[in-house]
Amino acid sequence: MQFMGVFFTHSGAIKYHRYLNSLEITNETMPVPRKLSSNCGIGVKFTTDKDINDMITEDIEKMFKIEDNNYMEVYDCN
């Protein structure tokens, strides 16, 4: 499954990128589509079959599952 993490800060996105690298999960930092967030503008896109709930960190504002170029929110910090 493919996901996009949206963050409060650029540093949060970079930390998550490093976190996924430590788990050997291929990921990419990239601009966040405006329809997903107006905060920091940098997100992390990755693919995993692991339980996404175990991969939520305090830096994440929202997490989206990507299917057929559609974004479905699977986590919101609020």
Give each language-model segment a name:
Residues 1, 25-44:
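Amphipathic, hydrophobic secondary-structure cores in small proteins
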Residues 4-5:
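A short beta-strand micro-motif
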Residues 8, 15, 31-33, 37, ...:
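Generic, ordered loop/turn and secondary-structure boundary motif
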Residues 9-12, 46-51:
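Helix N-cap motif at beta-to-alpha junctions
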Residues 11-24:
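Short amphipathic alpha-helix segments
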Residues 23-26, 57-59:
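Short secondary-structure junctions
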Residues 48-78:
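C-terminal structural segments of small proteins and small subunits
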